Amino acid sequence: MVKVPATPAGIPAIRALIGKGINVNVTLTFSLDIYSDVRKAYIDGLEDLKKDGGNIKSVSSVASFFISRVDTLIDDALEDNHPDLMGKAAIANAKLAYRDFNNDFTSDKFLRLSQHGARVQRPLWASTSTKNPQYSDVLYPESLIGRDTVNTMPESTLLAFNEHGKVSESLGSNIDDATQLFVELQEAGIYMKDVTSELLAQGLKLFIDSYDSLISDIEHKRKLLELRI
C-alpha cells in the first residue's frame, strides 16, 4: 500500500490513487473531521475507478489511527488534575471513528459499490501498546475489537493478549460515554481539535525527518561510489 497522510493536501491524492486502482494506507489519522474526508475520498475514488472501467474488487485501503499517542498527549496535559479522564480519550476517539465508519460503509452510496465487489476501507489501530505502566497491557487490544478492523500490535502486546486478553466486540459499545468524555475534556481545558492538530504536526515532522535522513544517506553513498569509479 502507498502511504498517504490524512492531511488536507492528502485527501485529493487518496481519491486520485484509489481512482487508479492503487491500494492506499491513509496514515496519521487522528481527527474525526479529517477522517470523514478520508472516507469520502476513498468512496469517490472507487466511483471514479468504476466509471473508468477499472476493477474495484482489487482495491484495498486502510485508515490508520495512532492510538496511544492520543492518551500520552492528553494525560500529560491533564497533569493528574483529572485522573478520572486519563487513559480514555484514545479509545473514545476510536469508538466514534468506528461509529462513523459503520455509518458510511452501510450507506446506499457504498452499498451500490459493494454490489460490484468494493471492499470497505478498514480502520487500522496502530500504536496499541500502553505507554503508561499503570494501565493494563491489553487495554487497547481489548477495547478496539470490531468487525472489519485491523490492529497492528507489537509482539509483546500480542503475547500479553494471547495470555490474558478478553475478546468481545467492544468498539460498538458505550458510544454515548465516548461523546460525554469529550465534553468533560473540554470542561478541563482539553480540546480534541487542538490535540489532533498537534499530533498530526508531530507525525508529519517524524516522516519528514526520516525522509530527509534517507535522502542524505543516499546522497552520501552516491558520492562514495563516484570516488571509487
Q: Which residues fall in each region the model found?
A:
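Short secondary-structure capping/turn micro-motifs that flank functional sites
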Residues: 10, 32-34, 201-202, 215
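Catalytic alpha/beta core domains of metabolic enzymes, predominantly
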Residues: 14, 22-156
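Phosphate/pyrophosphate-binding loops and the adjoining catalytic core of nucleotide-dependent enzymes
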Residues: 17
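Flexible, acidic glycine-rich loops studded with aromatic residues
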Residues: 117-222
